[in-house]
Amino acid sequence: MEQYKQEFIEFMVDSEVLKFGEFTLKSGRKSPFFMNAGGYVTGSQLKKLGEYYAHAIHDKYGDDFDVLFGPACKGIPLSVVTAIAFSELYGKEIRYCSDRKEEKDHGADKGSFLGSKLKDGDRVVMIEDVTTSGKSMEETVPKVKGAADVEIVGLMVSLDRMEVGKGGVKCALDEVHDLYGFETNAIVTMKEVIEHLYNKEYKGKVIIDDTLKAAIDAYYEQYGAK
């Protein structure tokens, strides 16, 4: 596993963004783990988060793209910090763009978007925290495609939970790929998280022991993507 992936897994744990225990998700599912991407709140956390996204995007998509698009609301800071990190790490100036929840009807920046305007010929990488249902893409892709003649290169999320999406068979990222045709990737998958943390001591404790691993296995037996 790449070094940046290992570091990102530990970063999620240290930031208390990825937690293990007993949780009830919005869907009503009982889950042995929970991710709250809103837990990144400090300057140093956001700086590191942008760097991990930049590493993963460069790893999967290279630098042949023009715009990072982050859907409102959580995608706005993600697109900003990742554009900064990409410039610093790879020397490539990438523009950021996000949509507004409500269209602004006045001022120099009026319209449906924040940041850079999308232009014909732009190659766009979309960025989100986590995709569990693909619903946000149903709203976002038509907006992006309708703004200009652009090509969506791919989507990057922080964690692939590897759970079935709306179709009940494939994970949400695969469903998005099948529906729209562009690549979908995550900085890490839950499989990689488990591989890195299972029965390994980290900062004086074993985060995923045999008991928790059994609970995770049972969860994926019921809800895991095929």
Residue ranges and their predicted role:
Residues M1-I127, T132-K226:
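PRPP-associated nucleotide enzymes
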